[in-house]
Structures are given as C-alpha cells and as structure tokens.
From Swiss-Prot:
Present in the aqueous fluid surrounding olfactory sensory dendrites and are thought to aid in the capture and transport of hydrophobic odorants into and through this fluid. Keywords: Olfaction, Sensory transduction, Transport. Signal peptide: none annotated. The keyword Transport applies. It comes from the Eukaryota. GO terms for biological process: sensory perception of smell. The lineage of its organism: Eukaryota, Metazoa, Ecdysozoa, Arthropoda, Hexapoda. This is General odorant-binding protein.
Amino acid sequence: TAEVMSHVXAHFGKALEE
C-alpha cells in the first residue's frame, strides 16, 4: 500500500543520511 511505501521511503532516506 502507499502507506507502506511512505514508511519505507522515510526509513531509507534516514539511512542514506547516516
């Protein structure tokens, strides 16, 4: 679902910043 994608995106974005 779009909700899951949004959550995953946020998680990945944070991981990339770290």
